[in-house]
Amino acid sequence: MILVLLTYKVELSEIDALRPAHVDWLKQGLADGRLLMAGRKVPVTGGLFMARGTLDEVKAWAAGDPFATAGAADYDFIEVAPSILAPGLESLGQ
């Protein structure tokens, strides 16, 4: 599993203009089984998502995010090997 932290590099007005396409991209990731969860940082300085796949696979997938293609965010990728999981989240350890 890969945790991806996004930090916005542009004004929120630019992020807001890109957000509908970004959300569509995230929804496609859910449908494809790649995306596990996504959300905004509080305060709104970026966001994060968790994705299935190898580091290289997730980096390649994230390159298609409209925030990435517009150069609107920096991405930090953290590979995670879950070992303790709440009930119902066991599949994240696979």
Name what the model sees in each region:
Residues 1-94:
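Conserved, structured core segments of small domains
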